[in-house]
């Protein structure tokens, strides 16, 4: 079957202070590739529609083009065309194309009670990095700031991991975390007709350090930040080793954070407190 995806980046809402045009264009591609990763589909081609403000110069357009091409090639796709027009704000609309075996697609609707809930990384860095970019009152070391801000400016889609998980046949449901970990857990639960008990919230160590210094809740940063582009999957417990090996074979890590339950609620257990 043909697999199509479109998503739009608007500068006013999606491009924080400090993000270059090159990074903005690349991010627009990553946003779309992440959804392909969650389905286990290799993107092949990219169409781009650009809304360009009058104040952009020729060199700016060149930076956008380079960023789009870099993002596409990073994930094995090609920019094959598109359109441009004048707009009041920078708008980058991406249309991503690929093909897949319909039976092999990883959907959001297949989780079963007892399945292992897992993610491909730790959360909160984008939320913390965004706070650093938007508010100089937040404190951190130079090294930690670089890590957190890089999560915002150079996000990464987990395409290799998604393709490997699809090949493993171990995944029962899958989504990406671009809208925030909390939202995608509720979405998976709703689509699959299950609940989740999350007893291993995957908060990044860097986020815990940032939160301690700035007296903010690291759990909030991990749950509600968004734009992290990790995969959130449920795995048949009898095939856990296959799923784990598949991701590790791509240089990644599959982190168990809980399990699917019959109760249609998402419950967070932090140090025994629910």
Task: Write out the residue ranges for each language-model feature.
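Helix-biased detector of long, well-ordered alpha-helical tracts
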Residues: 1-274
């Amino acid at each position: 079957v043909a697999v199509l995806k479109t998503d739009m980046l608007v500068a006013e809402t999606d491009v924080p202070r400090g993000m270059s045009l090159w990074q903005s264009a690349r991010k627009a591609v990553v946003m779309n590739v992440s959804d392909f990763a969650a389905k286990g589909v290799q993107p092949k081609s990219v169409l781009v529609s650009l809304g360009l403000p009058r104040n952009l110069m020729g060199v700016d357009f060149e930076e956008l083009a380079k960023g789009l091409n870099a993002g596409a090639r990073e994930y094995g796709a090609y920019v094959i065309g598109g359109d441009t027009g004048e707009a009041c704000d920078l708008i980058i609309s991406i249309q991503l194309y690929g093909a897949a075996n319909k039976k092999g697609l990883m959907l959001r609707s297949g989780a079963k009670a007892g399945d292992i809930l897992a993610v491909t990384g730790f959360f909160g860095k984008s939320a913390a990095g965004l706070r650093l970019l938007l508010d100089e009152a937040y404190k951190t070391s130079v090294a930690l700031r670089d890590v957190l801000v890089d999560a915002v400016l150079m996000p990464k889609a987990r395409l290799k991991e998604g393709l490997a998980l699809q090949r493993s046949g171990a995944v029962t449901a899958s989504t990406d975390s671009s809208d925030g970990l909390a939202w995608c857990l509720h979405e998976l639960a709703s689509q699959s007709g299950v609940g989740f008990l999350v007893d291993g919230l995957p908060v990044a160590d860097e986020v815990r350090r940032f939160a301690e210094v700035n007296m903010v809740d690291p759990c909030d940063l991990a749950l509600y930040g968004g734009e992290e582009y990790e995969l959130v999957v449920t795995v048949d417990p009898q095939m856990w080793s296959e799923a784990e090996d598949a991701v590790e074979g791509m240089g990644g890590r599959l982190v168990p954070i809980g399990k699917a339950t019959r109760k249609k609620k998402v419950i967070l257990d932090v140090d025994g407190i629910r």
